[in-house]
């Protein structure tokens, strides 16, 4: 999604695990920036694959400057310049992170031509330096379409995580984004969807639904250590973590704060200048290291996801944070995201009154049995499992086999749908 909120500082992983894929070179063109955003699916999976493979994570290739009228214009520029300054870094675990320099002028042919060659030259240099030959290329942002075929590559995977042409944060025309998207779909050996709504609406035949997952042990961690910033906040506490931008339903949040002045909101993450909440009930803590989150999360009573309901972009979202919320065991109240409409343990609201009713019910009637039931929903939906799935898909493709065993895959999808309806 858009810029997130939590410093990308993972808890240390326990050694190198065999996920079924080794000795390969992998380049991922990500839709986010490793140094700025909350970890997405690619971050989690590639960090694991880096234990036995050579992995290069390419930070998001800009799709154009935001408008100067954008309230976050200078903030975005400053962050991107800091990322450029790092260019290529190796992080613990062996994964390489690269921020290639490009010009934010994708809206015209000349700009695209310059960027195509500039990006290709940088990537070829890094591939040579790292000894990457015929790498598997994993694309997760449409703007990489212009450069992938300029690399001496092997397999091409295209992951679709969002409704890209509905992103209000992009300065590019919808037409260019759609053209890139269609181009990648035609050339990819496999198109991977991270959201159920995106997958169900797709007409691509070589597609695969890779559900989001959760770093379960991290978010389920119980700790007696409580962060100093939260000790003085009165209860009950409603919690949200993630970047707060135009997708937030500010009107609903303000109205709830007015009607329930005894409720306090703990907001962890960076905040866009577009989000202005005046009530003293809102407590902004800013960005926190990913590894330190348990010290803050244990103090929250109810987790909320107050997103705009009329925003097309967010309606396709698969919000990893909902699974992270469930892993804590705490009650979860969210706007009606298609991805979670049938998920056990999630309370859905559509109006201010329904939001208040859902939170009141959670505060009054929650039990230890409810907590364990919520955790059971995501306990086995871990990034280790997803990494094994991706490794198996790649292995089949490299062996010139269909990526998907159709019969087994259809059975898995059916089981997933039954599970969402509470049947398992």
What is each PLM-predicted segment?
Residues 45, 121-128, 132, 149, ...:
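Membrane-proximal helix-turn-helix segments that form the acceptor-binding/catalytic region
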Residues 112-114, 215-299, 322, 349-351, ...:
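Conserved catalytic-core segment of nucleotide-activated headgroup transferases in glycan assembly
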Residues 194-197, 210-222:
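Carbohydrate-associated surface elements
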């Amino acid at each position: 999604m858009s810029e997130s909120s939590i410093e990308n500082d993972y808890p240390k992983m326990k050694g190198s695990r065999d996920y079924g894929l080794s000795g390969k070179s992998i380049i991922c063109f990500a839709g986010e920036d490793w140094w700025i955003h909350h970890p997405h699916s690619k971050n989690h999976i590639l960090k694991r694959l880096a234990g036995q493979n050579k992995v290069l994570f390419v930070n998001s290739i800009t799709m154009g400057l935001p408008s100067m009228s954008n309230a976050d214009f200078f903030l975005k520029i400053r962050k991107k310049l800091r990322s450029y300054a790092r260019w290529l870094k190796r992080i613990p675990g062996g994964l390489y992170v690269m921020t290639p320099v490009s010009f934010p002028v994708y809206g015209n042919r000349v700009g695209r031509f310059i960027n195509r060659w500039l990006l290709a030259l940088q990537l070829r240099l890094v591939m040579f330096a790292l000894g990457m030959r015929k790498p598997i290329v994993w694309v997760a942002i449409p703007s990489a379409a212009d450069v992938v075929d300029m690399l001496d590559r092997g397999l091409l995977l295209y992951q679709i995580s969002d409704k890209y042409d509905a992103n209000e944060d992009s300065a590019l025309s919808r037409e260019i984004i759609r053209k890139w998207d269609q181009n990648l779909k035609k050339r990819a050996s496999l198109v991977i969807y991270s959201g159920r709504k995106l997958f169900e609406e797709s007409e691509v035949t070589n597609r695969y639904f890779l559900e989001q997952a959760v770093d379960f042990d991290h978010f389920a961690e119980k700790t007696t250590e409580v962060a100093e910033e939260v000790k003085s906040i009165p209860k009950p506490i409603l919690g949200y973590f993630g970047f707060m931008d135009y997708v937030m339903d500010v009107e609903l949040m303000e109205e709830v704060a007015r009607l329930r002045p005894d409720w306090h909101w703990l907001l962890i993450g960076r905040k866009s200048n577009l989000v202005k909440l005046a009530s003293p009930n809102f407590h902004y803590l800013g960005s926190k290291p990913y590894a330190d989150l348990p010290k803050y999360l244990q103090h929250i009573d109810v987790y909320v996801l107050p997103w705009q309901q009329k925003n097309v972009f967010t309606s396709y979202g698969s919000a990893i944070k909902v699974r992270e919320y469930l892993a804590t065991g705490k009650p979860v109240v969210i706007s009606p995201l298609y991805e979670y409409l049938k998920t056990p343990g999630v309370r859905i609201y559509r109006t201010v009154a329904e939001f208040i009713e859902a939170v009141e019910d959670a505060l009054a009637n929650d039990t230890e049995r409810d907590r364990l039931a919520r955790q059971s929903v995501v306990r086995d939906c871990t990034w280790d499992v997803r990494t094994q799935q991706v490794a198996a898909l790649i292995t089949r493709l490299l062996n010139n086999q269909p990526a998907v065993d159709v019969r087994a895959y259809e059975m898995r999808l059916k089981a997933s749908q039954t599970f969402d309806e509470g049947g398992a």
